[in-house]
C-alpha cells in the first residue's frame, strides 16, 4: 500500500492533499512514466495484444464504484479508493508526528539519529524510500533504516534463556520514558501538519 501510494504520488495521480485524480487529468505526466518503472509492470506483461495497444487504460482508469467513491483500478483487479488514501494519511501523519515530537522531547536533530530500527513484518517489507516519499519517515532516515524482523519474539527468547540479558532488559525497561502523544499539547498541530504529501 505504501509503495502504491508513493508511486501514484510520484506520477501525479495523487496530489499533495491526497486527492485521487483520473489518468485523463494527469495524462501528460502519466504518459512519461516507463511501464517497467511502475508498480504495474507485471500487469502489462500479462496483457493480451489487444490490451497492449491500449495499455494506458490499465494505468489510467479512475472510476466510481457502487457507492460513488473515486477509485484507481488497473486491469489486474487491484484498486485503491479515496478512502484508502485517507487512511494512509491518518496513519502516516500519526507516526510522522510521533517521530517529530520524540526528537523535540529529547532535544535532538534528525541528523543525530544513527540507526532507525524497523521491527515486525511491517518493517521487513517496507521500502524506506517510499516511506519517506509519502512522509511516513523523514528523508534523512532512509539510509539509516535497518529491518530487524520479529525482534520482540527474539528478545523474549533471549530473556528466557539468559539471566544477564534479562536483567539488562529489565533495567532498560525501568529507565524507559513513555511519551503519551494524545497528552502532548503540540500533537494535534503536528499531526495536521503531517497529513499532506510533499511532492
Show which residues each predicted segment covers.
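Helical "lid/coupling" subdomains associated with nucleotide-phosphate turnover
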Residues: 1-44, 72-199
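Intrinsically disordered, low-complexity terminal tails and inter-domain linkers enriched
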Residues: 36-76
Amino acid at each position: 500500500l505504501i509503495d502504491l501510494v508513493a508511486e501514484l504520488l510520484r506520477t501525479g495521480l495523487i496530489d499533495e492533499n491526497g486527492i485521487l485524480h483520473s489518468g485523463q487529468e494527469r495524462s501528460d505526466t502519466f504518459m512519461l512514466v516507463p511501464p517497467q518503472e511502475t508498480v504495474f509492470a507485471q500487469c502489462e506483461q500479462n496483457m493480451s495484444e489487444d490490451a497492449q495497444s491500449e495499455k494506458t487504460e490499465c494505468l489510467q482508469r479512475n472510476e466510481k464504484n457502487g457507492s460513488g467513491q473515486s477509485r484507481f483500478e488497473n486491469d489486474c483487479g487491484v484498486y485503491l479508493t479515496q478512502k484508502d488514501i485517507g487512511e494512509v494519511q491518518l496513519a502516516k501523519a500519526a507516526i510522522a508526528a510521533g517521530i517529530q515530537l520524540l526528537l523535540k522531547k529529547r532535544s535532538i536533530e534528525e541528523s543525530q539519529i544513527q540507526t532507525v530500527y524497523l521491527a515486525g513484518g511491517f518493517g521487513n517489507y517496507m521500502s524506506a524510500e517510499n516511506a519517506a516519499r509519502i512522509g511516513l519517515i523523514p528523508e534523512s532516515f532512509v539510509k539509516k533504516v535497518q529491518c530487524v524482523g520479529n525482534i520482540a519474539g527474539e528478545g523474549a527468547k533471549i530473556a528466557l534463556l539468559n539471566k544477564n540479558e534479562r536483567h539488562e532488559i529489565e533495567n532498560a525497561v525501568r529507565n524507559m520514558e513513555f511519551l503519551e502523544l494524545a497528552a502532548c499539547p503540540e500533537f494535534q498541530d503536528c499531526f495536521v501538519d503531517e497529513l499532506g504529501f510533499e511532492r
